[in-house]
Each structure stands twice: as structure tokens, then as C-alpha cells.
């Protein structure tokens, strides 16, 4: 993400395309496990919180430490298991002719384009554009346009409801609005309700 942000948006698009493509193809070959959302939200978090100089070095060291810890845990728990596929086999099996390959391509291209549009429009927090794209695109086996309409409806309804509730609430209660909406968000299963409650955060 730090490289993509330091260059022209058009070049950044290709940097993001390659980076996101590597993540999705190498680590998201079981979409029902939800790993795409996890890894790509982490990518967008890094994109939305850029650092330079000493802080960038510290971030790299933190990530290396996290990698070593996770690698050690993974090794201890899985060292006796036999895996049918190696890393390069997974990468070689990527194909646009399979449902998995089409879904992976949809996520890679959609997220990269979302970031590019956010950069070209000079959105303050491009991270949120990417996160919105992710919630629409990463659901395996579901048409993205259905979730896009649910998101649009949830945002419109949530924004209107937030405006009304914020005007009615006493000043002392307004600071707790995000906390309570977050708690309610955890109880929601339907995507449109989650989108609506996100407007309160």
C-alpha cells in the first residue's frame, strides 16, 4: 500500500492490482472460509493509515514479528498434516474458466478499481471506498449487484435515520451512539441492517 500511495494513481492501480492479486490467488482459494475479507481488510487498513520513515520501519518489524509468531503457531499445530497442494500449484490452478477464478478476478479488479476511483476523486479516506467494495465483492456465490443495492438502500436509510436520531438525542447521549450501534451491529445477520447501522459509527 505504501508504494501504491507514493506514485501516480494510474501506476498505483497496477501496484494494487498485483498486490491484491497475489493475496487473493495465493491465500483466498477457499472463499467460504472468509479469508479474503480478513486479508484484504488488513490491506485496506494499511492503505488508510500510511506511515513514513522510522514508523514505516517499525511497522515492517511488527509485521515480521507477527509473521514469525503466526508461522510458529501454524507449524506447531499443522506440522504432521499432509497437504495435497503446494503454493505454486495453487497459483498455477488460477483460471477464469472456473467459478473460483471468476470470483477471485472480480475481487482483484473490483477492489483495485474502487481504490483508483477514490484516488481520482480525491476522497479523504480511500480506505472506506475499498472497504465498501470489499463488502459487496467478497461474498462468494452471491451476485454483487444485489449487495450493491442493499448497501445503497442501507446507506440512504441509515443516513436519514442518523440525522433524525442525532437531532432528538440529548447532548450527553450523543457520544455513546457509535458504541450502541456497534453492539447492535454485532447482533445483525442481514447485510442491509449492517449497512444501516454502520452509518451511526
Segments predicted by a language model, with ranges:
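Alpha-helical transmembrane segments and their membrane-interface boundaries
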Residues: 1-197
Amino acid at each position: 500500500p505504501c508504494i501504491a500511495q507514493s506514485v501516480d494513481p494510474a501506476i498505483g492501480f497496477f501496484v494494487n492490482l498485483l498486490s491484491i492479486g497475489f493475496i487473493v490467488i495465493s491465500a483466498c482459494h477457499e472463499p467460504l472460509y472468509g479469508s479474503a475479507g480478513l486479508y484484504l481488510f488488513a490491506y485496506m487498513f494499511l492503505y488508510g493509515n500510511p506511515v513514513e520513515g522510522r514508523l514505516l520501519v517499525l511497522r515492517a518489524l511488527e509485521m515480521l514479528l507477527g509473521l514469525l509468531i503466526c508461522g510458529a503457531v501454524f507449524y506447531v499445530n499443522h506440522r504432521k498434516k499432509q497437504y495435497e497442494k503446494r503454493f505454486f500449484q495453487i497459483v498455477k490452478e488460477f483460471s477464469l474458466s472456473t467459478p473460483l477464478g471468476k470470483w477471485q478476478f472480480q475481487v482483484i479488479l473490483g477492489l483495485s478499481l474502487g481504490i483508483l476511483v477514490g484516488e481520482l476523486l480525491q476522497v479523504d479516506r480511500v480506505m472506506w471506498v475499498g472497504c465498501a467494495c470489499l463488502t459487496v465483492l467478497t461474498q462468494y456465490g452471491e451476485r454483487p449487484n444485489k449487495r450493491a443495492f442493499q448497501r445503497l438502500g442501507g446507506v440512504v436509510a441509515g443516513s436519514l435515520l442518523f440525522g433524525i436520531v442525532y437531532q432528538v438525542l440529548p447532548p450527553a447521549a450523543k457520544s455513546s451512539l457509535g458504541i450502541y450501534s456497534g453492539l447492535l451491529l454485532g447482533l445483525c445477520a442481514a447485510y442491509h441492517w449492517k449497512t444501516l447501522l454502520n452509518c451511526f459509527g
